[in-house]
C-alpha cells in the first residue's frame, strides 16, 4: 500500500465515516452535506492518525516497526507537514458546512494534536480522549443533519466500546509503552485491573444498549443484530478477565472491533430509513 495512504489508517478512517452515514440513515437525509461531512471526518481522522505516528515514531519502532515512519517509507518531517495540510483541509470543509460544524472540527483537531503530543501516554486520560473523539463523530453528524439528541446517545455507546478497546490495546502494547516511559493503565495499575475495567465497559454497553430501542430511536430490527454484538462483547469480556497476556489482549482487541462493527450494523438495521424500506417495525 502507498505509505501516504497507509499512514492515514484508511480502515479506521472509514469506520469514523460510518458514524456520519449512520446518522444519515436515522434522519433519512442523503444530500451533499452528508457527502461533505463524510469527507471531513475521513480527512480529520486520517490527519489524527498521521500526527499520532509523528509523535509515536520511537515507540512504534518497538510496537509497530512496519508502519510508514519507523520503516523509513515516510520521513517524520514530511508526516508532520502532511498532517497539518489534512487538518487545514478538514477545518475549511467543516466551516463550509456551518459555523458550529467548523468549530467542532477545529477543536477536535487541536485535541487530536494534544492527545498525540501529551495525553496519550497518561493513565486513562489518553483513553478517555480518543473515546470522546470517537463518540464526537456521531455528534458531528448529528449537528450537520439536525439530529443531535440521537447522535449524543449513539456517541455515548461508541465511547463505551472504544474505552474497552483502548484499554485492551494498552495491554497489548505494554512492553513498548513501558520502554518509552508511558504511564498507561496496565503499567500504573497492572494488567488484572486493566482487564477488569475493559470488561466493565463492555458489560455496561451490552446491558444498557437495548435502551436505544426502548427510547424509540431504533425499530425492533435493531435487536437481532444487537444480540450478536452483545454475544461478542460478553465473550471478549470473559476472555480478558480470564487472561491478560499479550496474545489474549490482541485477540480480544480484534473481537471488540467485530463487536463494534456488529453494533453499527444494528444501528443501521434499526434506523428509520431501513425500517421504511423493509416495511417492518
From Swiss-Prot:
Q: What is its EC number?
A: 2.5.1.42
Q: Which molecular-function annotations from GO does this UniProt entry contain? A: geranylgeranylglycerol-phosphate geranylgeranyltransferase activity; magnesium ion binding
Q: Which cofactor does it need?
A: Mg(2+)
The answer to whether the entry has keyword Membrane is: yes
Q: Which GO terms describe its biological process?
A: glycerophospholipid biosynthetic process
- Gene3D superfamilies per the UniProt record, alphabetical: UbiA prenyltransferase
Q: In which pathway does it act?
A: Membrane lipid metabolism; glycerophospholipid metabolism
Q: List the disulfide bonds.
A: none
Instruction: Spell out the Pfam families in the cross-references.
Output: UbiA
Which keywords has UniProt assigned to this entry? Cell membrane, Lipid biosynthesis, Lipid metabolism, Magnesium, Membrane, Phospholipid biosynthesis, Phospholipid metabolism, Transferase, Transmembrane, Transmembrane helix
Q: Which domain of life is it from?
A: Archaea
Q: Which reaction does it catalyse?
A: sn-3-O-(geranylgeranyl)glycerol 1-phosphate + (2E,6E,10E)-geranylgeranyl diphosphate = 2,3-bis-O-(geranylgeranyl)-sn-glycerol 1-phosphate + diphosphate
Q: Where in the cell is it found?
A: Cell membrane
Question: What GO cellular component term, any one, is given?
Answer: plasma membrane
Q: What class of enzyme is it?
A: transferase
Q: Which residues cross the membrane?
A: 7-27, 32-52, 72-91, 95-117, 128-148, 193-213, 214-234, 258-278
Q: How does it sit in the membrane?
A: Multi-pass membrane protein
| HAMAP family documented for this protein | DGGGP_synth
**What family does the database annotate?**
Belongs to the UbiA prenyltransferase family. DGGGP synthase subfamily.
Tell me, in a sentence or two, what this protein's role is. Prenyltransferase that catalyzes the transfer of the geranylgeranyl moiety of geranylgeranyl diphosphate (GGPP) to the C2 hydroxyl of (S)-3-O-geranylgeranylglyceryl phosphate (GGGP). This reaction is the second ether-bond-formation step in the biosynthesis of archaeal membrane lipids.
Under which name does UniProt file this protein? Digeranylgeranylglyceryl phosphate synthase
Source organism per entry reads Methanothermobacter thermautotrophicus (strain ATCC 29096 / DSM 1053 / JCM 10044 / NBRC 100330 / Delta H)
Amino acid at each position: 500500500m502507498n505509505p501516504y495512504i497507509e499512514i492515514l489508517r484508511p480502515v479506521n478512517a472509514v469506520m469514523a465515516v460510518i458514524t456520519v452515514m449512520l446518522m444519515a440513515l436515522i434522519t433519512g437525509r442523503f444530500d451533499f452535506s452528508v457527502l461533505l461531512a463524510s469527507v471531513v471526518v475521513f480527512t480529520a481522522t486520517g490527519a489524527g492518525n498521521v500526527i499520532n505516528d509523528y509523535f509515536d515514531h520511537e515507540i512504534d519502532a518497538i510496537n509497530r516497526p512496519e508502519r510508514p515512519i519507523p520503516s523509513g517509507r515516510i520521513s517524520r518531517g514530511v508526516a508532520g507537514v502532511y498532517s497539518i495540510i489534512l487538518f487545514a483541509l478538514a477545518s475549511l470543509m467543516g466551516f463550509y458546512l456551518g459555523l458550529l460544524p467548523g468549530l467542532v472540527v477545529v477543536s477536535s483537531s487541536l485535541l487530536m494534536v494534544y492527545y498525540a503530543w501529551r495525553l496519550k501516554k497518561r493513565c486513562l486520560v489518553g483513553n478517555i480522549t480518543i473515546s470522546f473523539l470517537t463518540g464526537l463523530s456521531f455528534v458531528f453528524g448529528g449537528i450537520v443533519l439536525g439530529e443531535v439528541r440521537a447522535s449524543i446517545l449513539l456517541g455515548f455507546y461508541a465511547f463505551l466500546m472504544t474505552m474497552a478497546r483502548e484499554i485492551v490495546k494498552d495491554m497489548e502494547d505494554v512492553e513498548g509503552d513501558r520502554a518509552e516511559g508511558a504511564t498507561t493503565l496496565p503499567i500504573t495499575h497492572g494488567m488484572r485491573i486493566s482487564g477488569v475495567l475493559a470488561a466493565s465497559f463492555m458489560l455496561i454497553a451490552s446491558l444498557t444498549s437495548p435502551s436505544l430501542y426502548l427510547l424509540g430511536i431504533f425499530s425492533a430490527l435493531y435487536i437481532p443484530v444487537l444480540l450478536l454484538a452483545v454475544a461478542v462483547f460478553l465473550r471478549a469480556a470473559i476472555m480478558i478477565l480470564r487472561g491478560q497476556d499479550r496474545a489474549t489482549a490482541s485477540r480480544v482487541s480484534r473481537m471488540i472491533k467485530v463487536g463494534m462493527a456488529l453494533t453499527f450494523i444494528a444501528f443501521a438495521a434499526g434506523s428509520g430509513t431501513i425500517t421504511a424500506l423493509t416495511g417492518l417495525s
